[in-house]
């Protein structure tokens, strides 16, 4: 279709392919300003008409979008999580994956793993909501001790939609937790029955008591039997009795220390006997605040011990100076007991307030001593 002639001052590039309109009346010479304005208004009206008639999908007015780009639809949760149907179909098939860069052992393990079928994957995706597609706790708790075969077996036993199968049953122990427990370093422990045959024996008990009166030590030393007093050497009277076989230190302030008893009852009985001796000498002695301050026990583990290896392994608890003292000094934190360990297997425990602390300390140290037993 032939287009009408254009005015000379209207550029031809501004209106390509415009529809035809009636030609202007012929003029002689240059057009006037009114004619130019009329032509301009007519041109703008034609452009506005074309803008209103342009289709919304026109390639001229719509942004260019590549054909291979897939836009997610937020209103559809299925497309938001499973956007590409082709990917969902091939998600369970790994036969086409190139595994040549992996070692032969890993490749063989991958071949042995059971693969979930496409039908089970589709049913699982349809039955579960997008929020329930998050990884289960069993998938998150994968540790060091789990190999690929155990993971594949546990995954193949899960059925789609069965939420009870995810949690382990309490009747069957979890083999994965056992493998993790075997990796964790632990202090060597032995059953209590192994060390039940060895019971520490109490060798000495130190107790204190308050007689609650001032004492004349010279008078006590002169009139009492089996008593000695040397103020230049020690500022207390040293008194002994035969039953129980103990020794007492009596101070002028009225405080007394009783040592040498083999049990708590013997220590109390001996302290009361010393208080009775002081009363018979004319002092108003009482028996107040009796308390056991220290208990000493000893035992024999019946095997030699490598003290050099023990002090290297337990440096923060032990000290060993064979030039100064032949025994290893082990300071236990709980219970707060000090142990003297000798290479022959003899053990001395001291620092306890009650008998149970002696037994507990020996039960704790016996597995450690057994780990450093001399073989030759």
Swiss-Prot record:
Which GO biological process categories is it annotated with? DNA-templated transcription initiation
One MF term in GO for this entry?
A: DNA binding
Give the Polar residues compositional bias ranges: 175-184
Would I find Cytoplasm among this entry's keywords? yes
Q: Which intervals carry biased composition (Low complexity)?
A: 126-159
Q: In terms of domain of life, where is this protein from? A: Eukaryota
Q: Which CDD domains match?
A: TBP_eukaryotes
Specify residue ranges for compositional bias: Basic and acidic residues: 108-122
Region: Disordered; residue ranges are 103-184
Question: What Pfam families does this protein map onto?
Answer: TBP
Q: What does this protein do?
A: Transcription factor required in complex with TAF3 for the differentiation of myoblasts into myocytes. The complex replaces TFIID at specific promoters at an early stage in the differentiation process.
Subunit details: Interacts with TAF3.
Q: Which family is it part of? A: Belongs to the TBP family.
Q: Which PANTHER family match?
A: TATA-BOX BINDING PROTEIN (PTHR10126)
Report the protein name in the record: TATA box-binding protein-like 2
Species of origin: Pan troglodytes
The record's gene field reads TBPL2
């Amino acid at each position: 279709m032939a287009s009408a002639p254009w005015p000379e001052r209207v550029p031809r590039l501004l209106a390509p392919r415009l529809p035809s309109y009636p030609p202007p009346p012929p003029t002689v010479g240059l057009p006037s300003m009114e004619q130019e304005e009329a032509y301009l208004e007519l041109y703008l009206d034609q452009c506005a008409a074309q803008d209103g008639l342009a289709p919304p999908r026109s390639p001229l007015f719509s942004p260019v979008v590549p054909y291979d780009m897939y836009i997610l639809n937020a209103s559809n949760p299925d497309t938001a999580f499973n956007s590409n149907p082709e990917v969902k179909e091939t998600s369970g098939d790994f036969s086409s994956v190139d595994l040549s860069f992996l070692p032969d052992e890993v490749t063989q393990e991958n071949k042995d793993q059971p693969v979930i079928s496409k039908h089970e994957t589709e049913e699982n995706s349809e039955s579960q909501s997008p929020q329930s597609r998050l990884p289960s706790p069993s998938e998150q708790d994968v540790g060091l001790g789990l190999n690929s075969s155990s993971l594949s077996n546990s995954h193949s036993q899960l059925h789609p939609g069965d939420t009870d199968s995810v949690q382990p049953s309490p009747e069957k122990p979890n083999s994965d937790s056992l493998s993790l427990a075997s990796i964790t370093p632990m202090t060597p422990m032995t059953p209590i029955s192994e060390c039940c045959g060895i019971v520490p024996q109490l060798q000495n008990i130190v107790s204190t008591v308050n007689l609650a009166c001032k004492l004349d030590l010279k008078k006590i030393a002169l009139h009492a039997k089996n008593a000695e007093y040397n103020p230049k050497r020690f500022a207390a009277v040293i008194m002994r009795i035969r039953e129980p076989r103990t020794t007492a230190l009596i101070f002028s302030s009225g405080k007394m220390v009783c040592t040498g008893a083999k049990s708590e009852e013997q220590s109390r009985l001996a302290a009361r006997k010393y208080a009775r001796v002081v009363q018979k000498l004319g002092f108003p002695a009482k028996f107040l605040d009796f308390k056991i301050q220290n208990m000493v026990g000893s035992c024999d583990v019946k095997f030699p011990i490598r003290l050099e290896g023990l002090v290297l392994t337990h440096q923060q608890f032990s000290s060993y100076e064979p030039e100064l003292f032949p025994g290893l000094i082990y300071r236990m934190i709980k219970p707060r007991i000090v142990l003297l360990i000798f290479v022959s297997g003899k053990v001395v425990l001291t620092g306890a307030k009650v008998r149970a602390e002696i037994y507990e300390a020996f039960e704790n140290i016996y597995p450690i001593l057994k780990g450093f037993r001399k073989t030759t």
